Structures are given as C-alpha cells and as structure tokens.
C-alpha cells in the first residue's frame, strides 16, 4: 500500500502533533509495518470503518484487518489531498487507488481498477490515536470480501 500526500490547505502546512501522529501511522501503513501503526494507537481506542460497518477496539484484531487489506490490495495507493486539523483532531481527505482480482465467467479472474475518495477523522489524545473513523463508498472500494472475514456470525 502506498500512501502519499500533499497538503492543499495553507493553514495546515505547519505540522502539529496530531498531524505527525497521523503521518507516522500512514507512513508505517504504507511500509507494511503494522506494529508501528498500532503503536500510534492508545491502549483504549476505536477504529471504525463505516463503509464496511466494522469496528475494532483490539490492536491484534485491527492488525489482522490491516494485513488482510494489504494482502487483498497489495498495490493500493492512498493519496492525501487535504488535511484539516484542530487541537486534537485531524481530518484527512484522500483518494485510494488499487486493482482487485475478482471472479469472471466460470473459472477466470479479471483485474478491476479501484478508485475511491474517502475521509478519515482521527482524534488524538495524549499523543496517540483514540478514535479513527473512515468514510468512503463500500461498493466502489470493492473491500466487501475482506469485511466478510471480520463479520461475526450469530446463530439464531
């Protein structure tokens, strides 16, 4: 996964602590260093992917989710287009591009280009991430197969 960014808002050109925490997490994510990503989170945190209707409060489970995303979308590239920040919150607008292999006809697969815009809202407390929420279009992202691995089935 590649993550790059350019800040389009002059007010956010000067990095603040919340910006640095987010950028450290995104850089580690791009490099596949999930231990470093998880180190940026508080012990008590919430990571919510609203498109997939998934919520993580456990670092091990979040690490599994991030690894599964990388496995299914190894060429993904997340580019930050705008960053807005306040005292303890960073909002990042981004574009995610990737390719996805999916079944086609009977036994073949086809590669489908993925391009989706999204927003991450990240709250920082004591220099660590306490809440991270991602918002984007589930259908365009084609991430639903990954989500199925993390959905708990309840017998009725």
Region annotations inferred by a language model:
Residues 1-156:
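C-terminal and inter-domain tail/linker signature
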